[in-house]
A protein has these predicted regions:
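Mobile gating loops/cap/lid regions near enzyme active sites that modulate substrate access
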Residues: 174-230
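Active-site-proximal cap/lid insertion segments
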Residues: 133-156
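Extracytoplasmic/periplasmic substrate-recognition and gating elements
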Residues: 149-161, 220-230
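Histidine- and/or cysteine-centered catalytic micro-motif in compact active-site loops
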Residues: 116-117, 154, 196-199
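Substrate-access "cap/lid" subdomains that shape
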Residues: 13, 18, 22-136, 162-186
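Flexible loop/turn segments at secondary-structure boundaries
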Residues: 1-2, 26-29, 119-122, 200-203, ...
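Short glycine-enriched nucleophile-adjacent loop
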Residues: 2-12
Length: 230
């Protein structure tokens, strides 16, 4: 997401010649109204401190408030995106990055983008219960039973954890990445896509091809200490 945001920023024009947006796209941002609302929720959790008071606060208190805001928003239909992402509507990012990219921002920069097969497995969703899957899907669509039926047919998988992983991976990573590539292609931008599907051996196979697993392969660091665990 950071790569796409930077490519959309007018001030970065000419600074990059190639880009890799791994497991990323241009949709994880908030408009000014949403950003102000999230900031108000966060500050409210802290007792609405002044700027000086906020700067002097214990980091633990800030992290706790952050987790509380994220938890509160996770139960709101259509608003369960992680709340702490960039806000557009200012000099650095005047409009939504996906709109700027659709209009040609960064089209002169060659890009490789894509996703992993099981992105959301990194967050432990493969252990999700059937009831939790129902709650998750109910928070993102008005037809949860229809969505679950579609994914069961498409994947031929009944396990609720892997269903949750597939749905979340498509929603958060894969579909936005495809839309990013389509937008760039419409502007004649050199764009390549990948789909990483190498399954990790970690956690008794519950990791699959999780988020970030492709990094050692992309940067040829698979021989680094600790990488062999996965």
């Amino acid at each position: 997401f950071s790569v796409c945001n930077m490519l959309a920023m007018p001030s970065t024009d000419g600074l990059f010649h190639r880009a890799i947006a791994q497991s990323g796209a241009a949709h994880h941002t908030f408009d000014p109204e949403e950003g102000s609302g999230i900031a108000a929720e966060f500050l409210g959790r802290l007792g609405n401190p002044s700027t000086d008071e906020l700067l002097a606060m214990d980091v633990g208190a800030l992290l706790e408030a952050q987790e509380q805001v994220a938890a509160d928003r996770s139960h709101l239909p259509g608003r369960n995106q992680e709340p702490f992402y960039p806000v557009w509507g200012h000099e650095a990012l005047p409009r939504a990055p996906r709109e700027l990219i659709a209009e040609g921002a960064g089209a002169d920069i060659a890009m490789l983008t894509g996703t992993n097969e099981d992105e959301l497995a990194l967050w432990g969703v493969t252990g999700t219960t059937a009831a939790e899957v129902d709650d998750m899907v109910g928070a993102i669509t008005e037809d949860p039973s229809g969505m679950l039926a579609t994914y069961r047919r498409r994947l031929d998988v009944a396990d609720p954890g892997w269903l949750a992983c597939a749905i979340g991976t498509d929603r958060v990573f894969r579909i936005p990445a495809v839309r990013l590539a389509d937008a760039r292609h419409a502007n004649g931008a050199d764009t390549w896509m990948y789909r990483f599907s190498w399954d990790s051996r970690a956690f008794d196979g519950q990791f699959g091809a999780a988020h970030a697993l492709e990094i050692p392969f992309a940067f040829n660091t698979i021989d680094r200490p600790g990488v062999d665990v996965f």
